[in-house]
């Protein structure tokens, strides 16, 4: 039979104080269970490194506590259960049995669950950082019971993995943080566009950004730099002009327009007598990030895009004779992941196998090392045979550094000449 205490006696006030403490303690444990366990380690690490000064301080205090999440969870639940189970014992000395059950359920539901979880779900970071030392003490006290249970949970469920975003999810998250989304984000339209372009660039290939061969301005290596050709080059407004041999699709090099400033048009100097730089040839399936990395090395800011096709394979016929079949290697069919990886590896090998490339860019400064090997990328025409496309290759376009940057920005880049043509 429960002991009843007379109102206003010392034991009565002690029981009231204990009941209030148990309700508040249970509410704190319930709120921390929701507040701390809802904070992922990734979010806390981001706040600790790049949050506001206040959030950095909070995250630094919470991170050591929540690293062992199963141990923290078991500790909070044990403390919460102990407080809720003890509450009816002290209420039983003040009211009847049914009254103790009714009051304890009401107090726990209202002040031990609803209100604490509502507060901690919104201010969990600040509250968790404030009571972090107290939580450490609770973990130490409950360690004999909580540690074996947490290890069992680690064995059965494994450690909680970091909640990282996939590219599509990260792009959507960035869009939500833009000020155009109307959700209170601070990112401008240009910022969200560039970030989205950087995320999408890994899925794009050279053929998605190149200029088709039919839209390219090229000059013949045997042409003469007379006044008409010089005026045409200046009118196009390009800094680099591709040079072809025999047919426009057989692009063998490029001419820097700035190197033509000292040439007198009246002398009609042949193009082959000026400095012609080598131009790399890259497959159309080369990822844009790979060619961007090659462009950044400074070897060339322009490359010829080629397509592997028309390989001839002999096929036996019914009468024993051999027929020829042409196979388009770069068909539009969806390649398997293994094929895609193999194609990328071949693409990089083809870029790296470009003849006479300077190999001094594996590290360090590019200026002095490049000046020593500058002649290696100049096309030597002193009796040497001019390069030609292989039989199984077909030039389909030209790609420049500007094309890749446009895909990254997802906007067209215009210079003075482009605006001149648009206005006219």
Swiss-Prot record:
InterPro entries: ACDP, CBS_dom, CBS_dom_sf, CNNM, Ion_transp-like_CBS. Residues 8-191 form the CNNM transmembrane domain. Glycans are attached at residues 273, 319. It is found in: Membrane. GO terms for cellular component: plasma membrane. Residues 210-271, 275-331, 355-416 form the CBS domain. The chain crosses the membrane at residues 12-32, 71-91, 95-115, 137-157. Keywords: CBS domain, Glycoprotein, Membrane, Phosphoprotein, Repeat, Transmembrane, Transmembrane helix. One of its GO terms (biological process) is magnesium ion homeostasis. Residues 321-340, 355-374 are annotated as: Disordered. The modification Phosphoserine is found at residue 331. Residues 33-70, 116-136 are cytoplasmic. PANTHER family: CNNM TRANSMEMBRANE DOMAIN-CONTAINING PROTEIN (PTHR12064:SF71), METAL TRANSPORTER CNNM (PTHR12064). This is DUF21 domain-containing protein At4g33700. It comes from Arabidopsis thaliana.
């Amino acid at each position: 039979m429960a002991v009843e205490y007379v109102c206003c006696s010392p034991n009565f006030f002690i029981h009231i104080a204990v009941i209030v403490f148990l309700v508040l303690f249970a509410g704190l444990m319930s709120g921390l269970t929701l507040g701390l366990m809802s904070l992922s380690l990734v979010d806390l690490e981001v706040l600790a490194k790049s949050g506001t000064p206040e959030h950095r301080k909070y995250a630094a205090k919470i991170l050591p506590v929540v690293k062992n999440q199963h141990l923290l969870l078991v500790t909070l639940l044990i403390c919460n259960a102990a407080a809720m189970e003890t509450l009816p014992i002290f209420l039983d000395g003040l009211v009847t049995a049914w009254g103790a059950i009714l009051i304890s359920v009401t107090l726990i539901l209202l002040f031990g669950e609803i209100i604490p979880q509502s507060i901690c779900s919104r201010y969990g970071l600040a509250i968790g950082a404030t009571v972090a030392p107290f939580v450490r003490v609770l973990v130490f006290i409950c360690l004999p019971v909580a540690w074996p249970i947490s290890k069992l949970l680690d064995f059965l469920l494994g450690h909680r993995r970091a909640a990282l975003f996939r590219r599509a999810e990260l792009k959507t998250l960035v869009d939500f943080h833009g000020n155009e989304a109307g959700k209170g984000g601070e990112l401008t339209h240009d910022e969200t566009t560039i970030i989205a372009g950087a995320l999408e660039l890994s899925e794009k290939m050279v053929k998605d950004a190149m200029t088709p061969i039919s839209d390219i301005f090229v000059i013949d290596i045997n042409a003469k730099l007379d006044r008409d050709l010089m005026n045409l080059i200046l009118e196009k407004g390009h800094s680099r002009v591709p040079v072809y041999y025999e047919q426009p699709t057989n692009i063998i090099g490029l001419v820097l327009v700035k190197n033509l400033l000292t040439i007198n048009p009246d002398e009609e100097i042949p193009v082959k007598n000026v400095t012609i730089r080598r131009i790399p040839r890259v497959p159309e399936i080369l990822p844009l990030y790979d060619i961007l990395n090659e462009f950044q090395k400074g070897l060339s800011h322009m490359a010829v895009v080629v397509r592997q096709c028309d390989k001839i394979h002999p096929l036996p016929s019914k009468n024993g004779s051999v027929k020829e079949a042409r196979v388009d290697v770069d068909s539009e069919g969806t390649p398997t992941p293994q094929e895609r990886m193999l194609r990328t590896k071949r693409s990089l090998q083809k870029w790296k196998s470009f003849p006479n490339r300077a190999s001094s860019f594996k590290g360090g400064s590019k200026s002095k090392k490049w000046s020593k090997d500058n002649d290696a990328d100049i096309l030597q025409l002193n009796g040497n045979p001019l390069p030609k496309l292989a039989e199984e290759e077909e030039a389909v376009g030209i790609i420049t550094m500007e094309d890749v940057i446009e895909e990254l920005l997802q906007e067209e880049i215009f210079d003075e000449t482009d605006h001149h043509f648009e206005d006219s």
